[in-house]
Amino acid sequence: MTLTDKLSHAFTNGTLIDDEFCKEMLRVGNFFVSVSIEGFEEANDGRRGNGHFQKALAAMDLMRSYRIPFGVSICYTSRNYKVVTSDEFLDLLISKGCVFAWYFHYMPVGQNADTSLLLTPEQRTYMKDRVREIRGVTGGKELYCIDFQNDGEFAGGCVAGGRIYCHINAAGDVEPCVFIHYSSANIREKSFQECLQQPLFKLYRKGQPFNENHLRPCPMLENPELLPKMVAESGAHSTDLEAPESAEHLCEKCRAYAACWQPTAESLWQKDHPERV
């Protein structure tokens, strides 16, 4: 197995997408991108730096001119969740040629993560319902939306660790997930097949699904007791490119959230799936 016979998907701020890059995407034929954007100009640039919003839109315009399909990556938080699901914002993306959108629940990754950006149960429930409304056949938008956290039931829970998906960072470290920065394999040193067989990935696949309630899919965010055990057992090290962080430190920031979300998640799951209760 090699990366040349698989679809590869990159998350990017879009600032390096130019004519040459677009031509290269057309040449290889199996590589596509999602441009990160988190709201309109003021809110987006407040998180991603001045000028990013316009550069992101320019990258979309360029890819559209080359007829390259692309998506967006949207991190939703307690502050922007309604804006990034508003008709006005979605219509802007559609007008730029965007065909799909990844919605990612804010994860408190990093030494200085702001846990106030984590959603309340009511806010997360709104996101669950709104994303399904957006992609509805009736009354929806011409934009296919996927909620990485709330759509677990359609994929059998967590998809990471090489079960369906994994992440490769800029240094070549092959990680279970874009939010889980731990690994013991690098694509520059091993084959892709070898990277998929690293101990941490095997533990991921052995443990999946991490919860029978697929509204609680993650071994970090909703089941924070699990990730530190897997990292310790596998011998994986932190691959955070900014500031290494232990799995214990990361998951400690998720414990209050997990406990708060659990009752709502159980209620929603029982309502939607009475046959599984």
PLM regions: where:
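Radical SAM/AdoMet-radical enzyme domain recognition
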Residues: 1-104
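Structural alpha-beta junctions
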Residues: 6, 68, 98, 135-142, ...
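Flexible, active-site-proximal loop/turn residues at the rims of small-molecule/cofactor binding pockets
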Residues: 16, 39, 107, 181, ...
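Conserved, mostly hydrophobic/aromatic
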Residues: 35, 172, 192
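Short, conserved loop/turn and helix-capping segments at secondary-structure boundaries
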Residues: 50-53, 121, 125, 185-190
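Generic alpha-helical structural signal
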Residues: 57, 87, 125-132, 193
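A C-terminal junction/extension of Radical SAM enzymes
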Residues: 106-176, 217-226
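Flexible mid-to-C-terminal extensions adjoining Fe-S/redox cofactors in radical SAM and related proteins
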Residues: 179-277
